A protein has these predicted regions:
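Glycan-processing catalytic domains of CAZymes
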Residues: 1-187
Length: 187
């Protein structure tokens, strides 16, 4: 895995050099258990620091869907991941993005409007600078279903739900949010 990290970081730096008008990003796996040790690092913050430095990363990006499992399920790793990303972004003075679950698949449920709002707003509460969606379109493999863009390339009900959430956020918070800087998070 360390060799893979080096190759990925090299590719990222090359993309920055060859296409400075583009914004390459490498989405990180979420932290869980001993993943840092699998990559050869003591802990996840050390891995994130090394990645940012080696890739000359201008932002961090990750996803963690553990709270979107079917049935009653609570996993503290959701907030642990937000904290790790937030702290690394603050240490390096770069933004972090969260890719939230928009499309049910495998054991992940179909996120309701409240689920989507919760994923977005918990990310923003931790200082997230960008929200992306997994996945925007419906892949034709496995059991992906009910994406914002359906298997026929048409807008689905989920697309309209996300549009309405964005409109609501922008109307309420857009003017102030972009000027804020995360200092503390409490729950």
């Amino acid at each position: 895995p360390k060799g893979v990290l080096k190759a990925v970081c090299d590719a990222h730096r090359i993309m920055l050099d060859l296409a400075p008008d583009r914004l390459p990003f490498i989405n990180q796996f979420p932290y869980h258990g001993n993943i840092a040790q699998l990559y050869g690092f003591i802990n996840w913050p050390e891995y994130l620091d090394r990645f940012v430095e080696a890739a000359n990363a201008t932002q961090l990006s990750y996803d963690c869907y553990c709270q979107m499992m079917e049935g009653p399920y609570e996993n503290p790793l959701y907030f642990q991941n937000l904290e790790y990303m937030r702290d690394a972004a603050l240490r390096h003075r770069i933004p972090f993005w969260n890719i939230v679950l928009a499309t049910p698949h495998f054991r992940y449920r179909a996120p309701s409007k409240d689920d989507m709002r919760w994923q977005i707003y918990t990310s923003l509460a931790y200082g997230c600078g960008g929200i992306l969606y997994f996945t925007w379109y419906t892949p034709l493999t496995c059991n992906y279903r009910d994406a914002p863009i359906d298997a026929h390339g048409e807008r689905s009900e989920r697309w309209y739900m996300l549009r309405d959430l964005h409109r609501d956020f922008r109307a309420r918070f857009e003017r102030v949010y972009l000027g804020l800087r995360s200092q503390h998070v409490y729950h």
